[in-house]
Amino acid sequence: MQTYLNPVLLAYGTIIIIIKIICFAGNTLVKVLENGKEVEKEIKDVKKDEMVLVRNGKEKRYAKVIDNKTTKGDFEFYIVKAKHLKDPSKTKEVTITPEHIMITFDEKKEIKLLPAKDLKGNEIIDTEDGFHQIYEISKTKLKNKYMLSVKGGVVFANGIFISTICSGDNARDLKPTLEEWKKLQRE
């Protein structure tokens, strides 16, 4: 096993990303396994060792929560709203910090990783029920932000397929790893 700059590891050709983030609002919903059943839980209530719904390539699976900590204070967040491409009455939204990396797709369905602060408001994102287009981005202030560390680097938050990587978290060191991660998502 070859070790890269902490906290990124490359093992047997598979990328394992264990990254601490401080990017989600506490009321963001993730799906966890409880007694063999999938239930929604607010990020602020997710505990270490719980299993959260993630994606590896196109396969949905569960990954272990490594840590979940609260940072108190006043923080800027972006509220990102998106509507379903085929049924605009279906909408989703997520509240994240400006540096939080969004997984977006261009017109050729190529993956582009963008911090929330760089979104233009027309990007395509993937969700549990198909592709959505971002139609509104607004700012808000919240008291706490939540650091959720998960294996795999992605999660479904409020049903949106989103990274668990903030551009401020050793982003310079992660660039090669993110390129490899993007390749895995196409497989």
What are these regions (language model features)?
Residues 5-187:
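HINT/intein-family self-processing domains that catalyze protein splicing or autoproteolytic maturation
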